Each structure stands twice: as structure tokens, then as C-alpha cells.
């Protein structure tokens, strides 16, 4: 159900991206760099883990309102098992490549989505590759800098879910 809602939201945002051109989602349409702090959820039903990570990103405006984005990240703190707290898991390296449509809500706030491919490794475990999507909100701190919050699904299946709430800042040139 979460995946279907995410797909619908991404589709709706793609359909309304033209509004971003008229409103000017950002004064900076060039290269952007971002860094974020991620609260990761590793769901392995019936249990889950809650590691913490960092994520770095770079994006470039492809068309007004549509960016191409690449992200790299890793876990920085292991997450405890929700049933047996002595068991822990950590996320290893992760990377993703995305198309990132966005639109202005007003002159300071913007809404964005991401849809693409991600590869996520669980330390001392498997690597998981596949479709990835997410939604986010950003706030213009000044002409070049934004604060953002996003929720991204890196892997969704019946046996494993990897998602993260990321809070960060990005800077554009």
C-alpha cells in the first residue's frame, strides 16, 4: 500500500511539474550539493531495526522543475532489533540515481519527488537493488541554500523494507 501511494504521489507531481516553470521553484537552476542525516528503518517482518546514517547528494537541473540526482550514503550507527535489543544491524554503502521533479508551493516552500534506482547493502548481509521512490519538502533559507526533509523507500518487498527520513541542507551554484 505504501508503495502504491508513493507511485501515485510521484505520478501526480510529474503531471504538475509545469507549474514549477511558471512559479520558479528555485533561483538556482544549476548544480546543487546536499548533505543529510538519515533515520533509517530496516523492516524484516516481524521485527525491525533503526540504524542512523548520512547521505550526500548532487543534482543538476535537467529541465526547469526536473532534476537528475545521484546520492551516496552509509550507516553511522547500528540499529537495535525491535524484539531482541541485543541484536543489531547496520546499513553499509548505499547509492541511488533519480529523476527528481519538483514544484513551488509558494516563494519559500517547494515539494519534490524522486523516482529511480537504488542499491543498498546491509553490513554483514546482502545487497538489495531495485526501484526506489520518495517525497520531500524544502524551504529556501536564502537564494542558494535550502533546508529539506524527505522520506525515501530504498527497497520494498514482503520480506524486507529499507526506508529513511532524511533531514538536511543543500546548496546550489
Q: Whereabouts are the PLM-identified features?
A:
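Residues that define the transmembrane beta-barrel architecture of outer-membrane proteins
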Residues: 29, 48-54, 89-95, 127-133, ...
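Short glycine/proline- and aromatic-enriched beta-strand/turn motifs that initiate or cap beta-hairpins
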Residues: 21-68, 72-78, 101, 109, ...
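Cleavable N-terminal export/targeting peptides
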Residues: 1-30
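Outer-membrane beta-barrel translocator/channel fold
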Residues: 72-89, 120, 147-168
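Surface-exposed, polar helix/loop patches in the mature regions of secreted/periplasmic/lumenal proteins
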Residues: 96-139
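Residue-level signature of outer-membrane beta-barrel architecture
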Residues: 60, 101-103, 137-139, 153, ...
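Outer-membrane beta-barrel "beta-signal"
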Residues: 32, 135-139, 146, 161-173
Amino acid at each position: 500500500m505504501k508503495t502504491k501511494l508513493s507511485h501515485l504521489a510521484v505520478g501526480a507531481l510529474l503531471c504538475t511539474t509545469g507549474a514549477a516553470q511558471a512559479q520558479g521553484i528555485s533561483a538556482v537552476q544549476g548544480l546543487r550539493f546536499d548533505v543529510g542525516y538519515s533515520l533509517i528503518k530496516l523492516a524484516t517482518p516481524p521485527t525491525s531495526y533503526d540504524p542512523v546514517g548520512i547521505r550526500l547528494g548532487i543534482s543538476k537541473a535537467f529541465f526547469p522543475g526536473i532534476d537528475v540526482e545521484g546520492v551516496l550514503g552509509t550507516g553511522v550507527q547500528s540499529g537495535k532489533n525491535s524484539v531482541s535489543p541485543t541484536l543489531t544491524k547496520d546499513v553499509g554503502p548505499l547509492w541511488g540515481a533519480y529523476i527528481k521533479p519538483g514544484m513551488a508551493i509558494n516563494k519559500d516552500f517547494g515539494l519534490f519527488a524522486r523516482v529511480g534506482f537504488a542499491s543498498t547493502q546491509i553490513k554483514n548481509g546482502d545487497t538489495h537493488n531495485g526501484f526506489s521512490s520518495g517525497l520531500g519538502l524544502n524551504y529556501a533559507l536564502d537564494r542558494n541554500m535550502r533546508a529539506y526533509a524527505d522520506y525515501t523507500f530504498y527497497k520494498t518487498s514482503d520480506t524486507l523494507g529499507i526506508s529513511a527520513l532524511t533531514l538536511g541542507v543543500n546548496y546550489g551554484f
